[in-house]
């Protein structure tokens, strides 16, 4: 890939145009280092997608390839459908700090956000304990 001078606004526009064409994609977020303005050489563009139905692996690869060709940057795709159950903190961070690229169904997006929030609030006290204990060990040199 060549040196990339694409702006965040251009990434948002191009990614939205490409993803919106796929009938199986209901909504998508841009998240990660580009959104936080922490881009370094070699940073990839993180995109999270919610699918109407479970996509085939080849379909995901095709989406990733289409995005990489159009945006001229390495793409890291996250599938949102099962994220609240498997990684509630990441799901929460995506909807809280990410940029919504588009949605085709407001009610599905609203229900998804509700589910993410409930799962995150369920595990947050445990995450806080784990993080506090981890930091204590680091500070004590263990």
Q: Predicted segment positions?
A:
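Short beta-strand->loop micro-motif that forms the acidic, two-metal-ion catalytic signature
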Residues: 46-50
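Catalytic core of pol beta-like nucleotidyltransferases
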Residues: 1-24, 36-37, 52-142
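Short glycine/proline-enriched turns and hinge-like loops at secondary-structure junctions
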Residues: 40-43
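Short gly/ser-rich loop at a beta-strand->alpha-helix junction or flexible surface loop bordering the NTP-binding
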Residues: 26-34
